[in-house]
Amino acid sequence: MSIRRRSTAAVGLAVAAALSLSACGSGASDDSAKSGAGSDKKAAVATGGKDFADAAKKTAAYGTDAEAGQFPRTLTHAMGTTELKSAPKRVVVLDVGEFDNVVSLGVKPVGYAPSEGDAAIPSYLKKDAGNPKNVGTINNLNLEAIAGLKPDLILGSQLRAADKYDQLSKIAPTVFSIRPGFTWKENYLLNAAALDRTAKAKSELDAYEKKAAKLGEDIGPDKPTISMVRYLPDRIRLYAKASFIGTILEDAGLPRPKNQQINDLAAEISPEKIDEADADWIFTGVYGDPKATKRDTAQSNPLWKNLKAVKEGRAKDVPDETWYLGLGVTAANLVLDDLRADLVK
């Protein structure tokens, strides 16, 4: 059975994003920004990555034509083809998205590369993750540590580790998606194909999509606009459609402010323009140490304090590790739970 499946929503997003778009939202240093042609009225937009526009479409074409349980099997992926002689048992994951993916499929990885500055296993995965060893960070892999674990499969992305692929593939069969982020569903199916757990992945995605649709139904026809604000050490972002959280909100049918209805990762604003985050509900995340960001500066601005959502208690902090860093179906389901708690009365 072929695993070459993708969601209709992702197809539309990839087609609509005809220009070079932004990189994924899981880190602070993956993206550049283009300004609004010198206009003070138009926010900068996070951009980058030559394959961003087509990433979901391309990733959906990757995978295997092997039947369930069939090994050896050959996987096509972002870096070419990889043969797996037998079902993997010792898996190393190079980002949180792959971590979420394998754990949701019942696999306890032997190694994990966390985000910069945070070596901990994400709390929402800890119960089912086993005891994976640290193998560096997403941007600074420890190849010796990876080799020492004697993996039989390495899962990662071209965006994070293309320059390490040749070395990694000499350690173990290595399968790369193009990038993390709004392609999380396609990445999940690719990882599942390598693990011979495609049926499980499809079942998990179907359940997620039904859960998202039910949330939208239960909120009712008069849906509030949702603004997504994230504070990073060197920027403030309003996350848009081509992001992990953007796909979740779209799946639930939740509308966005006009400045976030773009086929990019995010708009970028200064603390002085924090009122551009205005919406019926504002959800804020922080990447890393809040003191290293301009969150306090932005939220002490009278423009922030005077927003209706802020005055009426509809501006809320959300966990960065699920809403922005999770990049997998387990995190996506937890985001839906959080949204339900706030939006369904």
How would you describe each model-predicted region?
Residues D163-P233, V329-K345:
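Extracytoplasmic substrate-binding proteins
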Residues S2-L94, K200-I226, D289-R295, V318, ...:
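Bacterial Sec-exported substrate-binding components of ABC uptake systems
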Residues R90, V96-A145:
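A short, structured surface patch at a secondary-structure boundary
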Residues R90-V102, A201-P255, N259:
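Basic- and aromatic-lined ligand-binding clefts that recognize polyanionic substrates
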Residues M79, V135-L143, N263-S270:
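Short helix-initiation/N-cap motifs at beta->coil->alpha
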Residues K150-L155, P173, A279-I282:
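Proline-aspartate-enriched helix->loop->beta-strand connector
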Residues D280-K345:
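Structured C-terminal subdomain patch of bacterial secreted/periplasmic proteins
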Residues G117-P122, A161-D163, I178-L190, T225-T247, ...:
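Extracytoplasmic ligand-binding site segments that recognize negatively charged/polar headgroups
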